[in-house]
């Protein structure tokens, strides 16, 4: 069924709004994936704070104009599924990477983060970014280890001073 001009403009505006507020984007080819599997993916995406949309290539090209995701224009060929991460930069990449592992027909084309194109082969770089909470936990662990090491060195220095004095 053909879309009217107003419908196309609404789609472009909706995707453009999603792109403006997104931290990263992932483009995939969803040919061969059943409706039930796509419904499961969409549900998981909503829970992860990821906006997913299957959009015509010409419309998605217009939607990403003037955003950090303009670098993805070359990947908009064939059936295009675009996913925008709204809460965490690696959320969409992680979600689609896990989905692609289960679905052999589902293929990730590329991703974009801060205006940089990330090829499908390097999608792990984006998918393995720690979440905010994970990053804070890692920082706290580093600080905790550093302070424990400092304490040990201080106690050793104190012991050495007392031994020299004796």
From Swiss-Prot:
<keyword id="KW-0689">Ribosomal protein</keyword>
<keyword id="KW-0699">rRNA-binding</keyword>
<dbReference type="InterPro" id="IPR022973">
    <property type="entry name" value="Ribosomal_uL10_bac"/>
</dbReference>
<dbReference type="GO" id="GO:0006412">
    <property type="term" value="P:translation"/>
</dbReference>
<dbReference type="Pfam" id="PF00466">
    <property type="entry name" value="Ribosomal_L10"/>
</dbReference>
<comment type="similarity">
    <text>Belongs to the universal ribosomal protein uL10 family.</text>
</comment>
<comment type="function">
    <text>Forms part of the ribosomal stalk, playing a central role in the interaction of the ribosome with GTP-bound translation factors.</text>
</comment>
<comment type="subunit">
    <text>Part of the ribosomal stalk of the 50S ribosomal subunit. The N-terminus interacts with L11 and the large rRNA to form the base of the stalk. The C-terminus forms an elongated spine to which L12 dimers bind in a sequential fashion forming a multimeric L10(L12)X complex.</text>
</comment>
<keyword id="KW-0687">Ribonucleoprotein</keyword>
<keyword id="KW-0694">RNA-binding</keyword>
<protein>
    <recommendedName>
        <fullName>Large ribosomal subunit protein uL10</fullName>
    </recommendedName>
</protein>
<dbReference type="InterPro" id="IPR001790">
    <property type="entry name" value="Ribosomal_uL10"/>
</dbReference>
<dbReference type="InterPro" id="IPR047865">
    <property type="entry name" value="Ribosomal_uL10_bac_type"/>
</dbReference>
<dbReference type="GO" id="GO:0003735">
    <property type="term" value="F:structural constituent of ribosome"/>
</dbReference>
<dbReference type="GO" id="GO:0070180">
    <property type="term" value="F:large ribosomal subunit rRNA binding"/>
</dbReference>
<dbReference type="InterPro" id="IPR002363">
    <property type="entry name" value="Ribosomal_uL10_CS_bac"/>
</dbReference>
<dbReference type="GO" id="GO:0015934">
    <property type="term" value="C:large ribosomal subunit"/>
</dbReference>
<dbReference type="InterPro" id="IPR043141">
    <property type="entry name" value="Ribosomal_uL10-like_sf"/>
</dbReference>
């Amino acid at each position: 069924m053909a879309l009217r001009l107003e419908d196309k403009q609404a789609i472009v505006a909706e995707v453009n709004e999603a792109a403006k507020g997104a931290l990263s984007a992932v483009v995939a080819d969803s040919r061969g994936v059943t409706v039930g599997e796509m419904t499961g993916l969409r549900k998981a995406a909503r829970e992860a704070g990821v906006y997913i949309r299957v959009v015509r290539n010409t419309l998605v090209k217009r939607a990403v104009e003037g955003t950090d995701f303009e670098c993805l224009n070359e990947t908009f060929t064939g059936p295009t599924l675009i996913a925008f991460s709204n809460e965490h930069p690696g959320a969409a990449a992680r979600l689609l990477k896990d989905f692609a592992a289960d679905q052999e027909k589902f293929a990730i084309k590329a991703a974009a983060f801060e205006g940089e194109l990330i090829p499908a082969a390097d999608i792990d770089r984006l998918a393995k970014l720690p979440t905010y909470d994970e990053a804070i936990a890692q920082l706290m662990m580093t600080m905790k280890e550093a302070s424990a090491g400092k304490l040990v060195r201080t106690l050793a220095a104190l012991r050495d001073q007392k031994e020299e004095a004796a």
